[in-house]
């Protein structure tokens, strides 16, 4: 019999929110009787934007902005129907992107 697995990837700009969401998911899955591995921190994606401060000239004067995307991975092994129902009813913050693969 093959093991079933639910893989959950979380993405957010704020690392505190993503850690809280991951803890909620892990706690809910463990309470419903499933095995959980994670949250596993994945590499943080950093995007840097460089713009010229002045309107017309002064190309040497620039400003840089960065955007960091934090990612976490959670694997739920042998989920029960109770686990799936509990995860569907979970309330998570709006700043967290959730990607679920069965």
From Swiss-Prot:
One of its GO terms (biological process) is translation. Gene3D superfamilies: Ribosomal protein S10 domain. Signal peptide: none annotated. Coiled coil: none annotated. Part of the 30S ribosomal subunit. Involved in the binding of tRNA to the ribosomes. HAMAP family: Ribosomal_uS10. This is Small ribosomal subunit protein uS10. It comes from Macrococcus caseolyticus (strain JCSC5402) (Macrococcoides caseolyticum). The gene is rpsJ.
């Amino acid at each position: 019999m093959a093991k079933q697995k639910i893989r959950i990837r979380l993405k957010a700009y704020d690392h505190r929110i993503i850690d809280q969401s991951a803890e909620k998911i892990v706690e809910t899955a463990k309470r419903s009787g499933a095995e959980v591995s994670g949250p596993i921190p994945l590499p943080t994606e950093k995007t840097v934007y460089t713009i010229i401060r002045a309107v017309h000239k002064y190309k040497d004067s620039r400003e840089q902005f960065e955007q960091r995307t934090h990612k976490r991975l959670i694997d739920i092994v042998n989920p029960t129907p109770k686990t799936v129902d509990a995860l569907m009813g979970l309330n998570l913050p709006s700043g967290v992107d959730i990607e679920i693969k069965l």
